[in-house]
Amino acid sequence: VLEEQIKISLSNIKEFEMSSIKNKVIIAYEPIWAIGTGKVATNKNIEEVHSFIKHLLKDDFKIGLDIPIIYGGSVNEDNSLDIFKIKNVDGVLVGGASLKPNSFLKIISNSL
């Protein structure tokens, strides 16, 4: 499903345009079961999926290493530091925790 979603999303971009999107596109991976549930994927799962996306972009679209891939899925101040340490995670997509200023500031601090 994920592979199909990415391929469909990028299918209308011409080959010569691919190099110019690297500064304009960010891909966010958020497991559907994690949306608003408080459940977070395991670090291993996050790394595997992000690695899969990077390789797909590199092999099929020749842009894999240039497109940031961020993780979303119940990111909060308690788990963000560990998420930032995962290979191939270029950042996080913060939902509910962004509504709590102190929590959001801690997530930002964890990213540094």
Model-derived regions: residue spans:
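Active-site rim beta-loop-alpha module in soluble metabolic enzymes
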Residues: V1-G64
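Short alpha-helical interface patches
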Residues: M18-S20, N88, I107-S111
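Hydrophobic faces of well-ordered beta-strands that scaffold small-molecule active sites
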Residues: V25-Y29, L65-G73, D90-V94
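Active-site-proximal loop/turn and secondary-structure-junction residues that shape catalytic pockets
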Residues: P31-W33, V75-E77, S98
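Residues that form or flank phosphate/diphosphate-binding pockets in enzymes
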Residues: G36, D78-N79, N102
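Short, glycine/charged-enriched secondary-structure capping and boundary segments
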Residues: A41-K44, I83-I86, K106-S109
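Catalytic cores of alpha/beta
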Residues: V75-V89
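C-terminal helical cap(s) of enzyme catalytic domains, especially alpha/beta-barrels
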Residues: S98-L112
